[in-house]
Every structure is written in structure tokens, then in C-alpha cells.
Amino acid sequence: MAKSNKRRPAPEKPVKTRKCVFCAKKDQAIDYKDTALLRTYISERGKIRARRVTGNCVQHQRDIALAVKNAREVALLPFTSSAR
């Protein structure tokens, strides 16, 4: 016998769209040597923040991820957090 579904649907929250910072400012470039910029896209645990958290578009999120990985390879950024 099938269960009856008496749950109310959750009220829809308004979707807040963020504009990509790099699309808005065309002159701002993503470079692996700019660690101050890249640290804003890394969590305190050393993980790259998700696109839904940062609000970047697909292409710029890929560019940030690649720049963070390159900066880690040349020891400008840590692979993991230093605090335990």
C-alpha cells in the first residue's frame, strides 16, 4: 500500500544571484602569483571554495582553481591548513 504524502511543500526562497567579480571588473586578472586574491577563494582548511559560495561564473571559477593549484605547486599557498 502506498504512503500518502501529506507534507506541505517548503516555501520557495528567493534566489539571490551574485554577479561574477571578474566579469564585472574586466581589468582584474587571475594570476597564480596574486596570493592575496587567491586566499579569498580558499577556506580556512585550505580547500577551494565552491562556485555557489563565491558567486563566480564557470570560466572564472575554473581559472581560480587552476591558479590556486599552480600557486600550491610553487609553494606560494599551502596545500592544507597549518592549524590543527
From Swiss-Prot:
PROSITE patterns: RIBOSOMAL_S18
Pfam families tied to this protein: Ribosomal_S18
A single GO BP: translation
GO cellular component: cytosolic small ribosomal subunit
Name of encoding gene: rpsR1
Highest taxon listed in the record's lineage: Bacteria
Family membership noted in the UniProt record: Belongs to the bacterial ribosomal protein bS18 family.
GO MF annotation: an example: structural constituent of ribosome
Function: Binds as a heterodimer with protein bS6 to the central domain of the 16S rRNA, where it helps stabilize the platform of the 30S subunit.
Protein name, UniProt field: Small ribosomal subunit protein bS18A
Protein keywords: Ribonucleoprotein, Ribosomal protein, RNA-binding, rRNA-binding
UniProt keyword annotation of Lyase present: no
PANTHER family membership: 30S RIBOSOMAL PROTEIN S18, SMALL RIBOSOMAL SUBUNIT PROTEIN BS18A
Subunit structure of this chain's protein: Part of the 30S ribosomal subunit. Forms a tight heterodimer with protein bS6.
Species this protein is from: Mycobacterium marinum (strain ATCC BAA-535 / M)
UniProt-listed InterPro entries: Ribosomal_bS18, Ribosomal_bS18_CS, Ribosomal_bS18_sf
